[in-house]
A protein has these predicted regions:
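Conserved N-terminal segment of class I S-adenosyl-L-methionine
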Residues: 1-75, 79-81, 94-96, 127-133, ...
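A generic alpha-to-beta junction signature in SAM-dependent methyltransferases
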Residues: 25, 103-105
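A short acidic, helix-capping loop that chelates divalent metal ions and anchors anionic groups
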Residues: 62, 117-122
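Short catalytic micro-motifs in class I SAM-dependent methyltransferases
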Residues: 83-88
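A short, conserved alpha-helix within the catalytic core of class I
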Residues: 89-99
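Conserved beta-strand signature within the Rossmann-like core of class I S-adenosyl-L-methionine
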Residues: 106-114
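Short "lid" loop at the C-terminus of a central beta-strand within the Rossmann-like core
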Residues: 114-119, 152
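Short secondary-structure junctions
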Residues: 144-148
């Protein structure tokens, strides 16, 4: 199926893939799509030449049909893409620490979450991804946010493209 569906996190993913397109073949060989759902983002990453594994505990067609937080990965990934999964996490610190540990030393995280006020209740969203909270959680997990790309779509989502910090220290 050649059809590409634009979903949450699409613009951050395309920003990363287009800006890094010359490096994908030699710098970024594999990727993990957390909460991959129907695989639309996976198709886009594969189109750019990445070898992508999908993990989704609700989607039986994912290569890894399991919960990201409890799955024991046998390898590390150069790129991790995570779109609109973080707001559903009971422990955002554990989730981001697991992502950090699953990335290679020079790995990149492309992550997006909904942009709505923290006081607005959205069923199933138990974490806020408003910009200052999202940013602080990424910093505390060890990501280099000084050199991050930040995309904020009015009223829709906040996204970060970040690398692991080489000098992280709290």
């Amino acid at each position: 199926n050649k059809k590409i569906v634009i979903e949450w996190g699409f613009f951050a993913l395309v920003e990363f893939l287009v800006s890094e397109s010359k490096n994908i073949q030699n710098k970024y060989k594999n990727a993990l799509d957390i909460g991959s759902s129907h695989g639309n983002h996976t198709k886009i990453m594969r189109h750019f030449g990445l070898k992508v594994d999908q993990i989704d505990k609700y989607e039986k067609h994912a290569e890894i049909n399991n919960d990201f937080n409890s799955y024991n990965f046998k390898k590390k990934y150069d790129v991790i893409f995570c779109s609109h999964v973080i707001e559903h996490q009971r422990n955002i610190g554990f989730f981001l620490d697991k992502i950090f540990d699953t990335l290679t030393d020079f790995g990149v995280l492309v992550i997006s979450g909904p942009k709505h006020p923290a006081e607005r209740f959205v069923e199933g969203h138990i974490q806020s991804t408003i910009m200052p909270i999202f940013l602080q959680n990424l910093i505390f997990a060890g990501f280099d946010c000084k050199n991050a790309k930040i995309l904020s779509m009015a009223g829709i989502e906040n996204s970060f493209i970040v690398k692991k910090s080489k000098t992280f220290n709290l």
